[in-house]
Amino acid sequence: MEKINKLKKILKSENIDGYIVPKNDEFFGEYIPDYKDRLKYISNFTGSYGFALILTNQNFLFVDGRYTLQAHKQCGNLFKIKTIPNELPGDILKNKKLKIGFDPNLFTSRTMNIFFSKTNCKFIPLNYNLIDKIWKRKENKQKKKFYILPNNSASERYQSKINKIIFEMRKNKAEFFFISASENNAWLLNIRGNDSKYTPIPHSYILIDKMKNINFFCDLQKIPSSFKKNFDKIKFINVNNIKNILSKITRKKFIIDGSTCSFFFENIISENNKIINNQDPIYFLKSIKTKNEIENIKKAHIYDGAALTKYLFWIKNNFEKKKITEISAAQKLFNFRKKNKNFKFLSFPTISGSGPNGAIIHYKATKTSNRRLNKGEI
């Protein structure tokens, strides 16, 4: 409650009536590092999706059906829990005329339109994040390098992929394409990173023009020396310079994807340029798998299926003899998986729930919720 009260004091000093706190960070991935989890900080909610609407006199937490039970358990005392799409912010704000602030780096214009367009409220993009004013965040200073995919894993050479992007740009008569989805940048250049706990993505943005000039924006400490040799025609630029570079481009035609391009970047680009708001063509291009990719997908399923089969056999033969808990069971499955030499990490936290915990969608066992596996329970 102390954190919320501090935030509400800031609302008063900013002369606004409310503030929206999303789960995501500026890269809009499903999983974010702890030091960027502002929603968890202000609400205690640990699910992978949701946002808080904090008004001067009420607090609301919006989640989807996966997390309704979890949200009530974790923060039902301080927040009114609302389940999307049954209840939307527009329903609460319908007859109000409030000034509500938000961080434009953490929202897309599409998200704002979906959730907040049907109100009489004024939504104000702020130049700073209000949660950061009360939270002394400790950023992870360990910078793990990006890396290039081995040839037997890449679908095709990155130069060929860029030609396909240029074709899409010419088709739309666009002079620039701003790629804001990190996973699409990874596909385009055949690279990977360590910026998400469960997905090997390199947090980045790409700006490509019709002459194939490419600017790659990221934390430069993550760029290995091998990149300069392999990507000699690509400029690697500190992500802090992106606003300055985009602001200097005028009277051009840009392709952006409104589902991944932040409100902040869309505003900068649209101020002096014409925008074509299309779905990023990379989503379609990367959905077409080569024979090699299909074979690798099959192998991954076989390897993981073998680990899961060994785990189920172990559970069947040991759960009555030994004390097996939700956490120890999840650890055992992890141990079976990591025996494979190609194993990198999990694709999401293992959902290991027994008895009543099994009813919680996307449940993640903790020291306080951890239960023993008992006979007769699912």
Model features per residue range: what roles?
Residues 7-10, 14, 96, 118, ...:
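Generic, well-ordered alpha-helical scaffold segments in large soluble proteins
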Residues 18-22, 326-348:
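Amphipathic alpha-helical
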Residues 98, 102, 226-281, 286:
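Conserved catalytic alpha/beta cores of large enzymes that bind or transform nucleotide phosphates
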Residues 101-107, 153-154, 184, 281-285, ...:
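Conserved short loop/turn motifs at secondary-structure junctions
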Residues 119-140, 261-296:
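Terminal amphipathic helices with adjacent charged low-complexity linkers/tails
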Residues 376-378:
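Loop/turn positions that initiate beta-strands
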